[in-house]
């Protein structure tokens, strides 16, 4: 009986492994945060507008609402990178009182897929912490590795957060 049980457990484990080969990668996460010597409300005022990414992120030249309004779940924006490509994102959650919002990419030239992201501003001492967390997978057929995708998103988040800090601290 013990041998039958052990055989069944091994068979189930092997079946699970072979079926996992056909599933998408479990996903990647970028989690960046930065401490800022400014009140949370001041920092939130910089990042809260869904059509304001180009005002605080140095990589973007344009951000236009194409559907809905700022702070309205379902709003969509077209954002343009400084080197030209444009993509579309949709606001999936927004809470002004909690200083947070979430969004997802609808269409993008980036080598990532199933991208969702959340930005929050929280108090810390006399200042704030801005946290930007994204989940995604590497787009099939993009020719990029998971490390490439991770590096791209990590770099984008860090560049944005560094600039928010400069703006909020007046440097």
Language-model features and meaning:
Residues 42-46, 53, 77, 91, ...:
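Hydrophobic pocket/interface hotspot
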Residues 1-4:
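Positively charged n-region of N-terminal signal peptides that target proteins for export
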């Amino acid at each position: 009986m013990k041998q039958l049980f052990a055989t069944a457990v091994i068979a189930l484990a092997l079946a699970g492994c072979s079926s996992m080969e056909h599933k998408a990668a479990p996903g990647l996460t970028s989690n960046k945060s930065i401490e800022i010597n400014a009140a949370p409300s001041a920092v939130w005022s910089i990042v809260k507008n869904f059509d304001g990414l180009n005002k605080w992120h140095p990589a973007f030249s344009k951000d236009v609402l194409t559907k809905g309004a700022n702070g309205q779940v379902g709003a969509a924006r077209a954002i343009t990178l400084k080197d030209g490509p444009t993509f579309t994102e949709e606001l999936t959650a927004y809470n002004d009182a909690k200083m947070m919002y979430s969004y997802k990419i609808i269409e993008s030239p980036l080598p990532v897929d199933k991208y969702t992201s959340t930005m929050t501003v929280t108090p810390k001492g006399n200042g704030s912490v801005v946290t930007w967390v994204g989940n995604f997978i590497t787009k099939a057929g993009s020719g990029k590795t998971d490390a490439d995708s991770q590096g791209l998103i990590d770099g984008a988040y860090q560049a944005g957060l560094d600039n928010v800090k400069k703006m909020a601290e007046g440097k």
